Amino acid sequence: DELNPALSTYGLPLGDAFQMRDDVLGAFGDTAITGKPVGDDLREGKPTPLMAIATARANALQLKELQLVGNQDLTPAQIARVQEVIRETGALDELETVITRLTDEAIAAVQHVPFAQSVRDELITLAEYVSWRTV
């Protein structure tokens, strides 16, 4: 019973960090590494924290360019421009900061779980992989 809160304190932020990393990879991932077409999530118009931040911070011209998101026929040039707008708005940097914070929260939670140090080390390794994965 005492493990449930500690493991939840580890797992919940790590799950959020995993999903946010997936959102970044869906918008910026390298096809050769991820196996998914570049900008696939942009073509699909998936509502993600990355797009929410970019949209909230975008100026009028950038908003117009972000309206391309969800168009299945986005060209590589249009995808590159949307990616540029996401970077310009600071959305990518902000999401990276949030991923780091959530990962740090998960790692800190592991320190309080009554497991052998080797198990804690494995959980920390998992957290670091999840947050910085490229696939």
Predicted regions and their residues:
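All-alpha prenyltransferase/terpene-synthase fold signal
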Residues: 1-135
